[in-house]
Amino acid sequence: MSKETLQKLKEDFISSLRLDRSGRLNIETLTRQQANSQIWHSERRNRLTTSNFGRATDYGKATEPEAIVALENILKCKVNPCGLIIDEHFPYLATTPDGIIDEDFVVEIKCPFAVRDSITFLEAINCKKLLFCRLNDNGAMELKIDHHYYYQVQGQMHISKRKFCYFVVHSKNWTEIQLINYDESFWDNKMIDKLKIFYMECLLPEIINPQYGKRLLVDDIKDPEHILENIKTKNNMKNNLK
């Protein structure tokens, strides 16, 4: 397939994903059952979703309802279910937060299997069972900004147009909460360009012109030009050092 043909197919496919505000709101409403919704699976299949920045587990999903109840008891407010939210400007980006509160908050819940029997949060930290967060100077939980969970929640806030995220780590013995602010500069400087390149050059070509499915060989999937160029440059540098 020529580059021109591939580019035209990319543009047509992106256009097919675009929805007006009414369409985006309708999908969010229809997909609040998440994994139990056929529409949820269909609409997210061809999009890059923020959950891909994290690692979901069966244990975590099964424990989420319990964590939501714990959060509601702590905050004294209702956590509402949320369907698939599609980005207004980039229709191939989407998110499904674990919950939303009013107009300003998303909720992201982690129930790591590794801490299921930890008596306290501090014990889990000291035993190095929670590698994605640490204790800050005030002794409170703090999500590491270089961890993919941080990218996930920033993506959730941006796509859903909310200012804050309640990041919750829950076990049967304790619940820890961190209120994370939306960081527009982090999104602009660390995320959006990389997400666009990954989708347009890695994911989208495989969606519209699958190579892996023909012979089920990973070698059939061609790396994007910029990656091939970087590999070539790196190899040249190694050769020059010999």
Where are these regions (language model features)?
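Accessory terminal regions of nucleic-acid processing enzymes
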Residues: 1-242
